[in-house]
């Protein structure tokens, strides 16, 4: 056990010493390169000098060897020296050139084993944010609550909007319902890989829902209000029992009659939502507020109480009130002020006089005022 502990301590010390002197490895590599380059230059220098000397010796010894034959022995010696010089020069030059080429082609191959691991490059660090963004987007797309919205919400909004509280407000509510339904269809995404939420309708039902907007064709039924011709009977306002007749004006759905003609024109657009798979474009989202405004304005114009007011009703409002106002506690008030006041007078037990100058039929209200004066 002690020997193992000693061996481990020795190894740890060696590792620490190696880490301490690890910075010397690159210095040693640099020293090697410098030494090799210096040696190659020296060898090349010596080779050049020997070649030059051998050339001079040949130039001098050759004529002497030819002309002066007695000096044959020194000439042979000189030739041998020249040959050795030429060989040494060539070998030195080749070795020097080989060292230089090796340094140029493979500068750090010798110390590659001791070199540390390669660090990440600057380009890889710059590309890291894009890589992280792509991974985050892929994960967010697969989250059901964030990436893919089910079609159930859009369709439920459209159905809620179609329910109108009153007959007069049908056009307005239907326009809002259609616009919301279109928004829902555009915002929804085909949830192929995403199951619908717990309270949503089944996936098979959504395609059948858009056919519902064709129902607004029903407003054509108000053609029956031709019956309101009954109000002509009040030509005999002298009878006190006549006020029982005002029940007829309560029934008339006559005001919807002018709105009934333009109302069917608005539902002509709903067939467009039959193609929900198209993704919402940026321009369509920008045009949505103007579309909603136009639909609201059309609906308000078609409402008789807001948009279209008859000329006679305006005149009756601008005219004078009957003189019998103080005596009869408001009996002589003009009926052009609204049907709601006539209903209040019924509940209080007061009989209000009917005038033929209603704004709907375009008759003047002077007869009602004269009757009030006579009473």
From Swiss-Prot:
Residues 1-32 are annotated as: Polar. Residues 207-275 are annotated as: 23 X 3 AA approximate tandem repeats of P-A-A. Keywords: Lipid droplet, Membrane, Repeat, Transmembrane, Transmembrane helix. The full-length protein is found in the tapetal lipid bodies of immature anthers, the proteolytically cleaved C-terminal product is found on the coats of pollen grains. Not found in flowers, developing embryos or leaf tissue. Its main location: other. Sequence repeats lie at residues 207-209, 210-212, 213-215, 216-218, 219-221, 222-224, 225-227, 228-230, 231-233, 234-236, 237-239, 240-242, 243-245, 246-248, 249-251, 252-254, 255-257, 258-260, 261-263, 264-266, 267-269, 270-272, 273-275. Residues 193-210, 252-280 have a biased composition (Pro residues). Residues 33-112 are annotated as: Hydrophobic. Residues 316-331 have a biased composition (Basic residues). Residues 148-179 have a biased composition (Basic and acidic residues). Residues 211-251 have a biased composition (Low complexity). Residues 144-284, 303-375 are annotated as: Disordered. Many of the major pollen coat proteins are derived from endoproteolytic cleavage of oleosin-like proteins. Belongs to the oleosin family. This is Oleosin-B6. It comes from Brassica napus (Rape).
